[in-house]
């Protein structure tokens, strides 16, 4: 959420310093999930399985109103255990929503541990393809260039919705966080923060 709020702040919806000072504090509007009381945010989310169904509705409304906007949603792989995701996937195919693109953050981790131990998600490509979706596999979902190519392909896909399966590494960039489920909602200590920022600085300098 910090990244989402930061992007909106950079776009002028609210002051960036306000986000830095108030994020996730008691009584703050900058809570841990999107808050539609803030400008630039149309819907609250957080409860698993809500994002894709709402986006299907937005995409369908756009089609019926003759508007040319596109709808994007990001889902965690753990979220795919929710039945509402698959109901929405069927509806997106039924209405040929080629203005809809879903991105799955496939890092094999959720708040309660490994996704495969909770609810297996093998053959995601074939599952979505069987629901009538155009499926794009990105082997390195942390590669921005690869993701950009996938978004271009999605935009050029006609008559069916697109899902991008982005195989990612949770917490990539710092060994302190990488591939650890405990960082799903962990707030770093001052020492951890300093180490993480130093790791990210090294990566930035290496680019």
Label the model's feature ranges.
Residues 69-73, 100, 160-166:
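Generic beta-sheet signal
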Residues 144, 148-207:
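Glycine/aspartate-rich loop-and-adjacent alpha/beta segment that forms the canonical ThDP
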Residues 5-6, 84-86, 112-116, 174-179:
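Short acidic, glycine/serine/threonine-rich loops at helix termini
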Residues 10, 87-92, 118-119, 152-154, ...:
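Short, solvent-exposed amphipathic alpha-helical segments in soluble enzyme
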